[in-house]
A protein has these predicted regions:
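Conserved helicase NTPase catalytic core signature
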Residues: 1
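Conserved motor-region signature of P-loop NTPase helicases/translocases
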Residues: 4, 11, 15-203
């Protein structure tokens, strides 16, 4: 009944959709698409598919753009060639980085094409900065302590270059990493706002 009620589906950030979630949606959408007045619009970026740990697979979005689609209708793929979100230097870095790993890391032709054909144009917003820090084994007491020390150093350098703490954001893979980094920065008298990690630490 739901497949009859809803005619148009729009799914944003599709790369975050798990296989289980998509398998549950397919019958509903397929039923709706049997009508000529229906449509399915999906937006996503395969390069941002970072949720393998909860069932997400980049191939899922790739298949929808190929002959392996779950549906009987032909897909119409629209590539957004201009990046309006990032500054020029970040876009240049992304183009160079993804092209490099596409050519040198992947052996599958399908995956090579994902990364080597993803060049984006700048929106004209000049500036931006990308830095990559590689830790040497000689810096390690433990991997975690080396990370914490380097993060603290980057923050202090940024403050010396007239940035403020409110300009700085740290992203981590796990909550435990967030708690550990928060504790270390507190010990360095670097003020932080991290309600989630602090709350988890107290629980």
């Amino acid at each position: 009944k739901i497949g009859v009620k809803y005619k148009h589906f729009f799914i944003d950030e599709f790369q975050d959709t798990s296989i289980l979630q998509w398998d549950n949606l397919i019958p509903l959408i397929e039923n709706s698409l049997s009508s000529e007045e229906s449509s399915l619009t999906i937006s996503g970026d395969i390069k941002q598919a970072i949720y393998r740990w909860r069932g997400g697979e980049p191939e899922q979005l790739l298949n929808l753009c190929s002959n392996n689609s779950d549906f009987f209708i032909e897909s119409n793929v629209i590539d957004l060639g201009t990046n309006y979100r990032s500054k020029d230097e970040i876009i240049k870095f992304n183009n160079s980085f993804f092209n490099h790993i596409g050519e040198s890391v992947f052996t599958s032709l399908i995956h090579k094409n994902i990364y080597t054909n993803c060049i984006q144009q700048s929106n004209g917003d000049l500036g931006g900065y990308v830095g990559i820090n590689i830790l040497k084994p000689s810096e390690f007491v433990t991997k975690e302590s080396a990370y914490n020390k380097r993060i603290s150093g980057i923050i202090k350098d940024s403050l010396n270059n007239n940035y403020e703490l409110k300009d700085i954001c740290i992203l981590v893979r796990t909550n435990n990493q967030g708690i550990e980094i928060s504790d270390y920065l507190n010990s360095e008298n670097i003020e932080i706002i991290s309600s989630e990690t602090l709350l988890m630490n107290k629980s």
